[in-house]
Amino acid sequence: QVTPAALKQIFIDLKMRKETDENAEWNKEMALQRAYIDELDTKLIEILGKRMKLAEKIGQLKKEKNVAILQNKRWNEILGRMILDGEEKGLNEEFVLKIYKAIHQESITHQEKIINK
């Protein structure tokens, strides 16, 4: 339960932020930074697409030799390396784990399609 004093402090600490600003220079800089982000987002999707194509090729190789899709040793090596690389670039470990688990699951899905043909 929140006391009246605590509620008062919450309101004091509360900062209402504007959705945008009318300053032309600020808007120009925001547009520039957002354009950079858009460009990087496009590259991320492009790279992920290429990665999935490679996962499919690996799936084909595994199919030819009847090798299991999930390779725990390899997965653990990738995770460890990516966590360290992420930390060096200021990325939170949990964030890196979430991203790579999603990428890994998508890779498995692509390989399953190949193996189950």
Explain the meaning of each model-derived region.
Residues 1-117:
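Domain-level signature for soluble enzymes in the chorismate/prephenate branch of the shikimate pathway
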